[in-house]
Amino acid sequence: MPRLLTKRGCWITLAAAPFLLFLAAWGADKLWPLPLHEVNPARVVVAQDGTPLWRFADADGIWRYPVTIEDVSPRYLEALINYEDRWFWKHPGVNPFSVARAAWQDLTSGRVISGGSTLTMQVARLLDPHPKTFGGKIRQLWRALQLEWHLSKREILTLYLNRAPFGGTLQGIGAASWAYLGKSPANLSYSEAAMLAVLPQAPSRLRPDRWPERAEAARNKVLERMAVQGVWSREQVKESREEPIWLAPRQMPQLAPLFSRMMLGKSKSDKITTTLDAGLQRRLEELAQNWKGRLPPRSSLAMIVVDHTDMRVRGWVGSVDLNDDSRFGHVDMVNSIRSPGSVLKPFVYGLALDEGLIHPASLLQDVPRRTGDYRPGNFDSGFHGPISMSEALVRSLNLPAVQVLEAYGPKRFAAKLRNVGLPLYLPNGAAPNLSLILGGAGAKLEDMAAAYTAFARHGKAGKLRLQPDDPLLERPLMSSGAAWIIRRIMADEAQPLPDSALPRVAPLAWKTGTSYGYRDAWAIGVNARYVIGIWTGRPDGTPVVGQFGFASAVPLLNQVNNILLSRSANLPEDPRPNSVTRGVICWPGGQSLPEGDGNCRRRLATWLLDGSQPPTLLLPEQEGINGIRFPIWLDENGKRVAADCPQARQEMINVWPLPLEPWLPASERRAVRLPPASTSCPPYGHDAQLPLQLTGVRDGAIIKRLPGAAEATLPLQSSGGAGERWWFLNGEPLTERGRNVTLHLTDKGDYQLLVMDDVGQIATVKFVMQ
């Protein structure tokens, strides 16, 4: 009976052994899980073609370039598996024959001389380093079995491809291929594949950059094995043995540092693939370095290039020199908030075209104005009087842009831009106002470049794509016709040429901007394929006297444009939209008039949007007789009379806006354009038979303040003339509209006072204050 029980117990033990073994393995697996996940892994940012841009090492300073099996040349995989572990795809993580051989060699020698390690076991050692002892070997075997339990063969091989040591701080075939050879691991030759396959066996001793002879000998050993096993032909091996150990200049990836830093926060991936073009990025950074010597002290620059056909960002230079602290090289000016100056002007003109407020030849008024406490001026401190919208945009005049924004509405304008991804940054609690159009709000260069794509994307502004998988998103900003017209104006081709004469290749359309106090210089350009954004200035916001967009940013814009043209074929110009037609309009009314019509004082050819001919846009205060078109009554002699005079007949007359009178030839002023008044039945309120005169100070007078007085008080009177008075002191409008005005002068210097009445008569006087 005891013998029977013993035999039965043995059978029970044998039957239970697999279960107990499985239970023990399961428990050990739970107690000592595989260390697959790193807390702070190495990361790399790469260009769209896979070229590494910038590496971010892990806590141990290790650099990796993550790859998949598909990213690696089949030649390397053949060399690796056939040299290191021929039975990799079949064994369970441990090759019993190799282990037995290694164990016998180790036992007979009394020390570990042969590892017998499979690729799975090598991965186990990489994940969980251990001493080269028998206990360490058992631990390695256990980890290998764990790997095979939890992962597929492809996953284990992928771990090896990314964790194998290749010398120094390099881990993985991706990092090694780029660091040693300057190429993708997908493009390895037979010779290169063999060299890199053997390198992890002794990465310090076989480093090709330090020991090329050793690396060549090890490579040849692998090549011979490939020939013996029939993996590669003898001819291929022979040619590969003759290939010298060639290495690219050893350097870590150093492109787009600020862009790469930004991308770390946008992706959790160990390898962040971006839309940047590595070749273009390198050219842009070389250009920035060459440009550094032209910049004033403590100044920097920023550049962005966007392919407007698909909204991919192709180049991004955030500063002139990352390592130059005096120029705040660590500050990315592409996504910093700065005052854009006049760069917003094309948007307000395009939106006003769609709104039917203006057309390209609309008469605008570049004259002194004051709106409350806001008194804008032009960059050149002068005024140009009557000017078309096209000319105002080309010359970047401020007063016409303010006039159009006032009609469109600053709050509405800011909301429209915000809706398409161009937020304007205002001080806390501030509301959008007329200063927006002259740089009175902050903006980012990246947002500005994205918004400018509307001029190349049929009026739709796209969202920048930083990674290839980012969706293509866009929102309408203006109509296709308005975008086409504004782009032509920015290319300085506002004249409505015949279609046959339009350029076949899209020219560079561009706009500059200069912020208040010369703190920022901008230039944004749109060519056939790209939008180029340029900024120069001091990151700390201090002024750079003499820096403005045309002088500081446009030369850099042209250099970038030349680089782009040399790299890609020119794309054809977009055809003229059907909504855009040619027309001829008249000034001052702004609309077409028949030939010979006396109200057409000047004819201008222009593009028209949807055939619309908006009348001349007036300032808010220009109504009634101060406007452009109003009725007059004439007697049988052609003289002006009151409406209720006998035999009075009505006619409509177009005159120029009153503020433009000082810039008009005498024949175009109201005093000449309006027929003389009848003395027998004059128009109501008219005493223009008396010339307009100015009294209170004689021409050439010298004015002095009374002793102890802070100012000189100068009462002035006007007589004659008709209607209200318009007063200008040194070209600046005064708020008074009456016949008399009192000046309070505090500054010494030359003065010119001008008064104008409702019919355009002018009286002037010059004097000096001492």
Curated annotation (Swiss-Prot):
Q: Does the keyword Protease apply?
A: yes
Among SUPFAM superfamilies, the record links this protein to: beta-lactamase/transpeptidase-like, Lysozyme-like
Positions on the Periplasmic side per record topology: 30-770
Provide the function of this protein: Cell wall formation. The enzyme has a penicillin-insensitive transglycosylase N-terminal domain (formation of linear glycan strands) and a transpeptidase C-terminal domain which may not be functional.
The knockout outcome noted for this protein's gene is:
Deletion results in an altered mode of murein synthesis.
- Any GO CC annotation of this UniProt entry: outer membrane-bounded periplasmic space
- GO terms classed as biological process: cell wall organization; peptidoglycan biosynthetic process; positive regulation of cell division; proteolysis; regulation of cell shape
Q: What pathway, per the record?
A: Cell wall biogenesis; peptidoglycan biosynthesis
Q: Where is this region: Transglycosylase?
A: 43-213
Parts of the chain that traverse the membrane: 9-29
GO MF terms held by the record: carboxypeptidase activity; penicillin binding; peptidoglycan glycosyltransferase activity
Q: What is this protein called?
A: Penicillin-binding protein 1C
Q: Where does it localize? A: Cell inner membrane
Q: Report the active site residues.
A: E84 (proton donor), S342 (acyl-ester intermediate)
Q: Which UniProt keywords apply?
A: Carboxypeptidase, Cell inner membrane, Cell membrane, Cell shape, Cell wall biogenesis/degradation, Glycosyltransferase, Hydrolase, Membrane, Multifunctional enzyme, Peptidoglycan synthesis, Protease, Signal-anchor, Transferase, Transmembrane, Transmembrane helix
Q: Where is this protein primarily located?
A: membrane
Give residue ranges on the Cytoplasmic side: 1-8
Q: Where is this region: Transpeptidase?
A: 278-559
Q: How does it sit in the membrane?
A: Single-pass type II membrane protein
| Organism, scientific name | Escherichia coli (strain K12)
InterPro entries with a match to the protein in the record: Beta-lactam/transpept-like, Glyco_trans_51, Glycosyltr_51/Transpeptidase, Lysozyme-like_dom_sf, PBP_1c, PBP_C, PBP_transglycosylase, PCN-bd_Tpept
